[in-house]
Amino acid sequence: LVRPILIKFLYLVAYIFPDNYIFGLQSGIFYFMKKKIALIAGGYSDEYIISLRSVQTIEKNLDGEIYDLYKIIINREDWYHETADGSQIQVDKNDFSLSLNGSKIHLDAAFIAIHGTPGEDGKLQGYLEMIGIPFTTCNSIVSALTFNKNFCNKVVQGYGDVNISKSVVLYKHTPFSLGSVLEHIKLHVFVKPNESGSSLGISKVTAAEQLLPAIDKAFKEDNQVLIEEFIEGRELTIGVYKIKGEIHCLPPTEIISKNEFFDYEAKYTTGVTDEVTPAHISEDILEQLNRKAKLVFQNLDCRGMVRIDFILEKSSNLLYFLEVNTMPGQSENSLIPQQVKAAGMDLKTFYGSMLAEIL
């Protein structure tokens, strides 16, 4: 009598929690097998250490009683699983598996936390798509598109309800003249690498003689340089995510840099930037920000969590789109964790919902 009741109970548990557990029968004993999740960190960019901090926060806030977590480090030399004692177990790239204690570990899903290439530009996503491993971020095409600021601007500009600043793109091996650049765009401008996961190589240019050094600086980081019209105003950034088919916005943050702009130092040095969450903006501006952010998220077919940056222009009170960050930082003091807490949620629930969407 007990055994049939137990079997029915286990089937009920599996029905209620289909995303988290698999159960089996061995030697007459039922057992639960937790989903095996790869937490992927590292990468090839200057934000390698930031990625390790992000994955540390994610690991701390995922329930080890529900998931088996495997930290996977990717760098230019190797892909490996880092065990609790610091040992390195090689990843079999043929099927994204591990050989651990004589057993083959097949990973069920990936929680990606790599900033910059290959985790933010679609390369890693393309690999996971080919071998059939679900992951928490945008797909390979959307990741590649949003990583290229110029291409993303051109696509978003077609949405109608989103303002885009004027810009010019330069290519490293294509001749250009400063005169032609200044014919298309007026000073003041920002000069930045077109494809970069960090804020390195960015300059604010207020005089013509500053333009060429700024372009040279940006070309050291990338083969493409984007020159964008400077919009004076308040920088606002908002987390957006999708759960069960519904797009949600987190409370936005205003970024107030003590530097001239939000550069690499301002981004990662304590005390250089004030981050106000939630931002002190009117209900009308908040409604516009949410609407435009959801529009961009939906039309680009984003997945998981992204962060979308805007400038609220001082003179017109219009919102200008800056960029989509498909791999926002997740360290304890990063913007998304701030916004999750401001929304009254805890990171454990938030990250768990990201995994539930793909399992």
Regions found by a protein language model. Give the residues of each.
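Active-site nucleotide/adenylate-binding loops and adjacent lid/helix of ATP-dependent enzymes
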Residues: 34-41, 45, 104, 145-234, ...
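Peripheral (often C-terminal) accessory segments that flank ATP-dependent C-N-forming ligase machineries
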Residues: 3-5, 9-15, 28, 180-181, ...
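ATP-binding N-terminal substructure of ATP-dependent carboxylate-amine bond-forming enzymes
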Residues: 8, 15-16, 22-23, 29-147, ...
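Active-site "cap" helix and flanking loop/linker of ATP-utilizing ligase/carboxylase catalytic domains
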Residues: 254-306, 335-359
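Conserved metal-phosphate-binding beta-hairpin within the catalytic cores
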Residues: 229, 297-330, 340
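Phosphate-binding site of ATP-dependent enzymes
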Residues: 206-291, 315-320
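Residue-level detector of anion-binding/catalytic polar loops
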Residues: 68, 134, 163, 224, ...
